A protein has these predicted regions:
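Hydrophobic h-region of N-terminal signal peptides that target proteins for export
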Residues: 13-22
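Bacterial N-terminal signal peptides that target proteins for export
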Residues: 1-10
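Residue-level micro-sites within transmembrane alpha helices that shape
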Residues: 6-7, 18, 131
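Carbohydrate-interacting regions of secretory-pathway proteins
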Residues: 21-248
């Protein structure tokens, strides 16, 4: 895509690869409102080797997440994708393994609802591991469900959310799980996330796929899986989506 919007991408590859910290899930029950909340802070063009997943004009690289035979039905206008409520999640036609992802998103400028009912969506790495998208600007909710959380597992290190309606960025380094020939897990998934240029997930090890109010075990999936975006029935917008495949 030649006419992408937004701030110039901050080069993250070496920095993210160097992150080796591990966060503890801690003693709190999942989605506990008593869990300490993160501190609130004030928070270009793709590389030549990137695969541009949204060209600003159509959804030719996307399909319905539930069926490869169904098209993606979200709205496209003014260089962005907007969730069309009740049409279902969308997924990339191309499959990806370990990767670097850049994606920009914005929740509705008009504030409606509270908690999880305000600008909710999600970015699913390998179709199963959710980075939460939410309007988390002056909007209390459980820590492991706010924007930039690994939903149901890790809160972000800080709340770097911008105001509703403003464009925000996620820059992600993803290393998916690995299994041996018998299907036994040999390497859990790890992820590093920058929200608006701020480190919020520091090479965390995931306990398994995302699920609501439970933590299911890993399943023996292929190394390469689609990237998916969530229809949570809110008109969240996405743009400037690109990915770089990393050596396994």
């Amino acid at each position: 895509m030649r006419t992408l919007h937004g701030r110039k991408f901050l080069v993250l590859g070496l920095l993210a690869a160097a992150q080796a910290g591990a966060q503890d899930l801690g003693p709190w029950p999942q989605h506990s409102m008593d869990r300490p909340k993160p501190a609130i802070i004030d928070p270009g063009p793709p590389p030549s080797d990137a695969i541009v997943l949204f060209n600003g004009h159509d959804l030719s690289n996307w399909r319905n997440a539930d069926s490869a035979d169904k098209p993606a039905l979200w709205k496209v206008e003014n260089g962005y994708i907007e969730v069309a409520p009740h049409t279902g999640n969308i997924a990339t036609k191309q499959l990806f393994g370990d990767c670097q992802l850049h994606i920009e998103w914005a929740t509705p400028a008009k504030v409606e609802g509270e908690g999880q009912e305000r600008g909710n969506s999600g970015v699913f790495m390998a179709g199963k591991y959710e980075i939460q998208v939410l309007d988390s600007y002056d909007n209390p909710t459980y820590a492991d469900g706010q924007a930039a959380s690994m939903f149901g597992q890790y809160p972000p290190l800080v709340n770097a959310s911008r105001k509703p309606g403003e464009w925000q960025t996620y820059d992600v380094i993803w290393h998916g799980p690995r299994f041996d020939a018998s299907g036994k897990l040999t390497r859990p998934a790890r992820i590093t996330v920058f929200h608006n240029g701020i480190l919020v997930q520091d090479n965390v090890t995931l306990s398994g796929p995302t699920a609501f109010k439970k933590r299911p075990p890993y399943t023996n999936d292929p190394v390469k899986m689609p990237l998916a975006l969530q229809d949570h029935e809110f008109p969240v917008r996405f743009r400037n989506i690109w990915i770089r495949e990393l050596a396994n």
